[in-house]
Amino acid sequence: MHDWLNNLPKAELHLHLEGSLEPELMFRLAERNKIALPWNDVEALRSAYNFGNLQEFLDLYYAGADVLRTEQDFYDLTWAYLQKCEEQNVVHTEPFFDPQTHTDRGVPFEAALNGISAALADGRELLGISSGLILSFLRHLPEEEAFKTLEQALPYRNAFFAVGLDSSEVGHPPSKFQRVFDKARGEGLLTVAHAGEEGPPEYIWQALDLLKVSRIDHGVRAAEDPKLIARLIEEQIPLTVCPLSNTKLKVFADMRQHNILDLLEQGVKVTVNSDDPAYFGGYVTENFVALHESLGMTEAQARRLAQNSLDARLAY
């Protein structure tokens, strides 16, 4: 079943480039940039990946991102991810890029964006993988910071097609970012947002009604609100679900408790994604395999999930 799932053509719609930074590459970049890491070796770093919640993960994620300094670093990061896409027959990807993670520590916006864009262009030309980049705002920072990031990005408007919202969800509702999302839409950008991962169903309503999103990232807590589920089905709003991430961050205590197949059978347009694969133990194929092994996902269900991901693409 692993090979069959691996060969299934699919799209990935929920992937943080910084979260695909494998320990080996992190150490290589640290050496290149003469940065001392707080771990002695790759194995020590891997054992640090045993975090228990979103905040513990984010602390590690931001520490790891510190090795990304130059345009070449961002190219290498993105290219490594695209090679993994090729291995797993991910034919289209719409990754997130968090500029604030880098500009706040002095990395020039254009260095990061140019490196990522060059790799995505090579992915299209050399690997045949289509893509579109999503500029994502960090929700634990003020909306004013998101406005600054959008202003920085607009001269490079053709490099990305949408804006998103990620980072610590609890206490940072989508409503906090309504004005900056209005401005982004005014510039012709599409919108997506993380909602209903650790936050309540109300955050999903806000993302739909205030941020006018085309897609909900995560969204698994929608299951707690029957009216919301009915709306997601009626409007066929895609959810970019990340099963291994959800269990690693204890959104579900165990994969056997995950609700993605229940949502699928109800008619919700759910998709399978890897989120931060270097940290959560698997890329898209490993997420499909986990659903098969823990939930008994059938070939027919896998086909529907893969087709959903292709249908839910926003970048063409």
UniProtKB/Swiss-Prot annotation:
InterPro entries: A_deaminase_dom (IPR001365), ADE (IPR028892), Ado/ade_deaminase (IPR006330), Metal_Hydrolase (IPR032466). Binds 1 zinc ion per subunit. SUPFAM superfamilies: Metallo-dependent hydrolases (SSF51556). One of its GO terms (molecular function) is adenine deaminase activity. Zn(2+) binds at H14, H16, H194, D275. One of its GO terms (biological process) is nucleotide metabolic process. The record marks H218 as: Important for catalytic activity. Pfam families: A_deaminase (PF00962). Its EC number is 3.5.4.2. This is Adenine deaminase. It comes from Stutzerimonas stutzeri (strain A1501) (Pseudomonas stutzeri).
